[in-house]
Amino acid sequence: MANSKSAKKRALQSEKRRQHNASRRSMLRSYVKKVIAAINTGDHKAATEAFNAAQPIVDRMATKGLIHKNKAARHKARLNAKIKALAA
């Protein structure tokens, strides 16, 4: 438990950030799941549109520090590879 005034403030800030980051992380996962769902249906056009919507979100979360930039690149590369496999 926080005893000093500054420790209490930091605890409040930490909780606020945790909730904000959880919301952002949930949004990121939702966008990625939409792409995966479109891929699983086999609809190339829908998968491409979902990927085009998800790509800037993934990049933004990496820029904000929510996920590592390499993880963002890995997500995009794997999803794009699956979409290209649909077209083939």
UniProtKB/Swiss-Prot annotation:
Origin superkingdom: Bacteria
UniProtKB keywords: Ribonucleoprotein, Ribosomal protein, RNA-binding, rRNA-binding
A single GO BP: translation
MF terms (GO), sorted A to Z: small ribosomal subunit rRNA binding; structural constituent of ribosome
Gene3D superfamilies: Ribosomal protein S20 (1.20.58.110)
One cellular component term from this protein's GO annotations in UniProt: small ribosomal subunit
Pfam families assigned: Ribosomal_S20p
Keyword Ribosomal protein attached: yes
Region Disordered, annotated ranges: 1-27
Entry function: Binds directly to 16S ribosomal RNA.
NCBIfam families tied to this protein: S20 (TIGR00029)
UniProt xrefs under HAMAP family: Ribosomal_bS20
Family: Belongs to the bacterial ribosomal protein bS20 family.
Protein name stated in the entry: Small ribosomal subunit protein bS20
